[in-house]
């Protein structure tokens, strides 16, 4: 069960990178990049931080560099920082999309955007609370923090759209939550 839980992180993390190259590279390149990235970037960093490696609380850095410790409860470093760095590098290498920013393409189906955002919101409960590895108070606090964070982001995005455009949008609310 723990292995499958960890594999969901490994499978979902490349999805965060997709926005940097969507519609600009071929599907075979996506599969090739994803496989290489998981093996050579994600897996080593997950081990270094979560698996007792040199950046973990039990590793070399903690024992050698007094006061140095790494705490990554649910993937801030392993998932988000790694994906962000990869996305920035890919975006820089590929350059801007054709027609951007003069041609902005709105989403084709706002209903599906909202369903996807809702699925992500619920999925975060599993990732964040599941990282406690127990159904206890820490997991409950993780779920509460997850919900409050996403809800606050929605409200802030609504306010920003209202100030900027005079009315909020469904896609904007979903974007804020994500």
Residue ranges and their predicted role:
Residues 1-178:
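Hydrophobic alpha-helical transmembrane bundles of multi-pass membrane proteins
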């Amino acid at each position: 069960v723990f292995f499958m839980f960890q594999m969901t992180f490994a499978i979902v993390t490349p999805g965060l990178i997709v926005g940097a190259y969507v519609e600009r590279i071929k599907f075979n390149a996506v599969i090739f990049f994803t496989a290489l990235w998981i093996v050579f970037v994600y897996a080593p960093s997950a081990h270094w931080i979560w698996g007792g490696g040199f950046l973990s609380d039990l590793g070399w850095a903690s024992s050698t560099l007094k006061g140095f410790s790494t705490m990554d409860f649910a993937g801030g470093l392993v998932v988000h920082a790694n994906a962000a760095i990869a996305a920035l590098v890919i975006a820089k290498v590929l350059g801007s999309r054709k027609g951007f920013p003069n041609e902005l393409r709105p989403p084709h189906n706002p209903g599906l955007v909202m369903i996807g955002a809702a699925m992500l919101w619920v999925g975060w409960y599993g990732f964040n609370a599941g990282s406690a590895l127990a159904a206890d108070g820490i997991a409950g606090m993780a779920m509460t923090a997850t919900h409050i964070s996403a809800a606050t982001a929605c409200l802030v995005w609504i306010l920003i759209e209202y100030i900027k455009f005079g009315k909020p949008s469904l896609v904007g609310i979903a974007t804020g939550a994500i």
